[in-house]
Curated annotation (Swiss-Prot):
Gene3D superfamilies per UniProt: 5' to 3' exonuclease, C-terminal subdomain, Cytidine Deaminase, domain 2
InterPro entries reported for this sequence: MPN, RadC_JAB, RuvA_2-like, UPF0758, UPF0758_CS, UPF0758_N
Protein name: UPF0758 protein HEAR2468
Pfam families per record: RadC, UPF0758_N
Positions of the MPN domain: 102-224
Binding site for Zn(2+): 173, 175, 186
Motif (JAMM motif): 173-186
Keyword line: Hydrolase, Metal-binding, Metalloprotease, Protease, Zinc
Length: 224
């Protein structure tokens, strides 16, 4: 049955307008995005198929066009729409950080890094360079590695911090394995970067490890 044949109070779009997006399930939110289903399936059914196929929203958001198009009813047009929505969300959070709330809103930093890093099939090391008022200057993906390892060079980070005239930085990388706890190597690297940046009067405010929906904060755990 098409969603247009459902009782109005059960239709995802109408429920969103009346009660807000937070009450909708993942499949219902995707149905609003999709607008229509395919033969024999409503948009909600198709939304459920998408979540089941990719295992999670993070898996869906990081899917390639080829993988995305394997689901009947999905193709380049919907893929482009989804990527545009994700990029708008990233830019919205980036604007919030640039407004000078990096320290006052650690949750915004976490959300931004989750959007940026979760779902990647390789390790990526990014740095948020901040000015003296804790406003974001730039977020730079400085190093990219494999499924289990990324080579990070402190000298390059020091050079970048000087180049951006940064007063402080926030470090972040992802764990494609899905486990957010930092390794011994992560802890050693964090301290090495802290010491190297201290020599040029740049503070390390935090180091986040992103693993899907989980984010580990070195600062929150008292490891800085």
């Amino acid at each position: 049955m098409a969603i247009t044949d459902w009782p109005e109070e059960q239709r995802p779009r109408e429920r969103l307008i009346r009660h807000g997006a937070a009450i909708l399930s993942d499949a219902e939110l995707l149905a609003v995005f999709l607008r229509v289903g395919v033969t024999g399936k409503s948009a909600v059914d198709l939304g459920r198929d998408m979540v089941a196929h990719f295992g999670s929203l993070n898996g869906l958001f990081s899917a390639t066009l080829n993988d995305f198009s394997k689901i009947n009813g999905l193709g380049p047009a919907k893929y482009a729409q989804l990527q545009a929505v994700l990029e708008l969300a990233r830019r919205s959070l980036c604007e919030e950080l640039q407004a000078g709330v990096a320290l006052n809103s650690p949750q915004a930093v976490k959300q931004y890094l989750q959007l940026l890093l979760s779902g990647r099939a390789y390790e990526s090391f990014v740095i948020l360079f901040l000015d003296v008022k804790n406003r974001l200057i730039v977020c730079d993906e400085m190093f990219r590695g494999t499924l289990t390892h990324t080579s990070v060079y402190p000298r390059e980070i020091v050079k970048a911090a000087l180049g951006h005239n940064a007063a402080s930085v926030i470090l972040a990388h992802n764990h494609p394995s899905g486990t957010p706890e930092p390794s011994a190597a992560d802890q050693t690297l964090t301290q090495a970067l802290k010491q190297a940046l201290m020599l040029i009067d740049v503070r390390v405010l935090d180091h986040f490890v992103v693993a899907g929906k989980q984010v580990y904060s070195f600062a929150e755990q008292g490891q800085l």
